[in-house]
Amino acid sequence: MNFSGSPVQLPLLQVHLPGEVPYRTAWAWQQARLAHMIRDPQLPDGLLLLTHPAVYTLGAGADPKFLKSLSQPIGSPAIHPESPSEQEPEILRVERGGEVTYHGPGQWVGYAMLNLKRHRPDLHEYLRQLEEVVIQTLAHFGLQGERIPGLTGVWVQGRKVAAIGIKVSRWVTYHGFALNVCPDLAAFEAIVPCGIPDRPVGSLVHFCPEVTMAAVAPVLVESFCQVFGLQAQAVSLAEWLGEPRLSDKLLGESTAQTPKRK
């Protein structure tokens, strides 16, 4: 499937949309693809677009004070707890930059894995490009996305609708962006989102009540391709991981349906 519909033969972007995936699982998928991309510089760029069950994550240098009243222990995505709580979302410290944020249903999370040696090896420019992906997506729905000097992310009418946090290894990127479409914004009240106390969080549905997750997904992919000069190709999980001989069932893929444009 060609998301962009472009007749020009652009470099490929391998896209996988598995639905809802636990954070630890998606983290492991990124680690697997990262190893392949470092080992094989010819492997195409990749985008994993999914949703998570409720979870809070902190960047590598994030300050726990922004957790406010949350008292759960801070874990690692690489270590599975012996007795996970079914009542409270986990709190995980990960490699990305940035402070604490929330992921949950109603939010598209995009894990962008690009070899920046094929683009522009400039991390500040890369952050601005991820913001531009969101800004172009918002424009499709008639919304004006805004940047705030000195901060990373995208705002609409003063409300932050997209958070961005990245990690780069040998110029291969991972982690990425989170776009609030229709999440439960009450979940953000337990934290100081991104460590910014005076900037409220918002969502697309607040400004466009009829917008759906299914409608936003293909626009995000198309905007990503426009910004980075790529052509999207939908692939299986095994292909996305660089392990085409393995079945998705063995890799533990979510059984959720891939969203389609309405």
UniProtKB/Swiss-Prot annotation:
UniProt xrefs under InterPro entries: aa-tRNA-synth_II/BPL/LPL, BPL_LPL_catalytic, Octanoyltransferase, Octanoyltransferase_CS
EC code(s) of this entry: 2.3.1.181
Gene3D superfamilies referenced in this protein's UniProt entry, alphabetically: Bira Bifunctional Protein, Domain 2
Keywords: Acyltransferase, Cytoplasm, Transferase
Catalytic activity: octanoyl-[ACP] + L-lysyl-[protein] = N(6)-octanoyl-L-lysyl-[protein] + holo-[ACP] + H(+)
Chain residues that bind substrate: R96, G97, G98, E99, V100, T101, Y102, H103, A163, I164, G165, G176, F177, A178
Residues of the active site: C194
Segments forming domain BPL/LPL catalytic: 41-232
A Pfam family the protein falls into: LplA-B_cat
Keyword field contains Ribosomal protein: no
Function: Catalyzes the transfer of endogenously produced octanoic acid from octanoyl-acyl-carrier-protein onto the lipoyl domains of lipoate-dependent enzymes. Lipoyl-ACP can also act as a substrate although octanoyl-ACP is likely to be the physiological substrate.
Annotated HAMAP family: LipB
Protein name (Swiss-Prot/TrEMBL): Octanoyltransferase
Naturally occurring in which organism (per UniProt): Synechococcus sp. (strain JA-2-3B'a(2-13)) (Cyanobacteria bacterium Yellowstone B-Prime)
Phylogenetic classification of the source organism: Bacteria, Bacillati, Cyanobacteriota, Cyanophyceae, Synechococcales
Gene that this sequence comes from: lipB
